[in-house]
């Protein structure tokens, strides 16, 4: 579910509002499809575009948030913030798809093509976090 648009980006939810045991797989599958589609678009263009995707997996606070006059279903919490930080790191690593250690673990053998970028300092976090790149 595309939950909201944020400037030139968007927040997509997998496993909310309905629980999905394979949410990490769904998110990575969608990301790979977007990258594939971008490759086809760029092949037919003189102005190639790049996208950056960050995927994290974990618990969130989900529900209708807002005033009584305008409520909006959304998710908040550290998981959302961390995914946003991952997305922003794509510029630093010249990458397009970064995932957290939690996503890598949830993928199991389906994440065997993940390349470790090591423990990376993340803005707003005291300890460096293990980051993985997918192609």
Task: Enumerate the language-model features and the residues they cover.
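Helical mechanochemical/support elements of P-loop NTPase systems and associated helical scaffolds
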Residues: 6, 23, 30, 57, ...
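A structural signal for short, well-ordered beta-strand segments
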Residues: 10, 51-57, 131
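Catalytic NTP-binding/metal-coordinating core of nucleotidyl cyclase/transferase enzymes
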Residues: 1-29, 73, 91
């Amino acid at each position: 579910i595309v939950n909201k648009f944020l400037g030139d980006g968007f927040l997509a939810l997998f496993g909310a509002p309905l629980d999905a045991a394979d949410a990490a797989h769904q998110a990575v599958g969608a990301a790979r499809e977007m990258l594939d589609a971008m490759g086809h678009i760029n092949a037919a263009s003189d102005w190639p575009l790049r996208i950056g995707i960050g995927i994290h997996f974990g618990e969130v606070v989900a529900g209708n948030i807002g005033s009584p006059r305008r409520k909006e279903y959304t998710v908040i919490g550290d998981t959302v913030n961390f995914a946003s930080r991952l997305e922003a790191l794509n510029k630093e690593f010249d990458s397009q798809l970064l995932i957290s250690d939690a996503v890598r673990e949830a993928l199991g053998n389906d994440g065997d093509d993940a390349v470790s970028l090591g423990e990376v300092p993340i803005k707003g976090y005291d300890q460096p976090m293990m980051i993985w790149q997918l192609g």
